[in-house]
C-alpha cells in the first residue's frame, strides 16, 4: 500500500512518536489530520509541517481521546476536510500509576484506542461506504512483558495487543479491506520517558536506570517501523517489536 495521496488520522500527534508518525507520512505523500490535547505544542508542530509540506496537506484539531464526542467530531472533520480516511494511528498515551491518574491512563491508553479503532472501522470498512485502509495501534514492549515500574501502563498496553489482534481476526475486518497491526517499541527518547515521576511511575530512580540501560531509540527510527506496518499489505494482526539493541522483530503469535 502506497501512502501517496492517502488520508491519515493520528492521535497524540503534537510531540514524540505521534509527531514522528505524522512526519514520515507527510514525507511519503500522505495527507494528515493531527489530533492532541496539547494545543500549544500541536500548533508549533502544525506550523513546522505546513512550512515544510504545504498548508493543504496537514491540519490539526484539539481532541481528547477519552471523550466519545470529541473523537466522533474529529473523525467526521477528517472526512469533511480530506474526503475520506485510509490510515488511523491510535497513538495517544500517558503513564499513571497512582490515584487518580491510573484511571485516566486506562481512559486514554485503552479506551481511547478502542474508541479510535471502532471509529476507524466505521469510516474505512467498504461495506459501510469506506475505501478500506489500515489501523496501527501503538502498544509497547510493556504490552508483551511485565513491567514492575508501571503495572497499570503495562496492563493497558497488554490490552491493546489483545484487543487489536482479536479485531484483526474478525472475518468482516479483512473482507472489507481493513488491516490492523500493533507496534511495540521499547524505550524511546520522548517526553513520556524524560518526565518519569512518582505519579506516573513506581520506583522512579530504578526505572530511569532501566530505561537507559539498553539505550533510547529516536522517534524517527520507530516511525520507520510504523510505516512498514502501514505499507505492507501482507501484515494483518502483526506485532512489530522495536528496540535499540535488537532492531525490528516480528513477534511470533498463535491463533489459538
Which positions does each model-derived feature cover?
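Canonical Rossmann dinucleotide-binding motif of NAD(H)/NADP(H)-dependent dehydrogenases/reductases
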Residues: 2-33
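Active-site-adjacent segment of SDR/Rossmann-fold oxidoreductases
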Residues: 28, 145, 166-178, 200, ...
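Conserved glycine-rich Rossmann-like NAD(P)H-binding loop of the short-chain dehydrogenase/reductase
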Residues: 28-44
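Substrate-binding pocket helix/loop in short-chain dehydrogenase/reductase
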Residues: 98-106
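Active-site helix of classical SDR
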Residues: 117, 156
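Residue(s) in the substrate-gating loop at a strand-loop-helix junction
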Residues: 140
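C-terminal helical subdomain
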Residues: 182, 201-255
